Amino acid sequence: MLPIAILGGTFDPVHNGHLRVAWEAAEALDAQVRLMPAHVPPHKPAPLASAAQRVDMLERSLAGQSRLVVDTRELRREGASYTVDTLRGLRAEFGEAQPLILLVGADAFGSLPTWREWRQLFRLAHIVMLTRPGRTEPWSGELVGEAVPRRARSPRELQDTPAGKVLSIPVTPLDISASQVRALLATGREPRWLVPEPLLADPAILAPYRQQR
């Protein structure tokens, strides 16, 4: 069964680093990847762009292909965006047999014990770490105890079961950040080659970041 993977974030704005990671994960896992903009991230400042503006940027960026899609369920939920609630919603919608995958960076994986109901994440989905060459993150003892016995040897194992496996896949380390893009726009510069080309087609699309000046 084709897995459904989720990649969360504020996407404020979406940039080429987000899209490259999502595409590489889709190909490596033979999965549909859903990019999920967060409503109110628990550990980050509120986004500069509105929810509607961030969705519009994502939809423009993903036009013309079907492997990466936008999922707005977190924006429709009031309050903070907690991953465990999102996974419960996906599980209820797609059923117990559907393979679900949570995509996280290696740094985020290392911090899982600080997440709400973090042990439940392994019961609701597989967790795939997106790793970059030369970077390692320490794991706490409780995370080692939860994750190591769940390690998968190949993406195929994630297709054969609905949840509970841990896998690492390497991704291209594009050195791009949303804060970098926002800083360029705030000083009147263009983030060409850093953001998807459709975002540069109309000055109004990136206006929320230019208006910081």
Identify the role of each PLM range:
Residues 1-213:
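Nucleotidyltransferase catalytic core that binds NTPs
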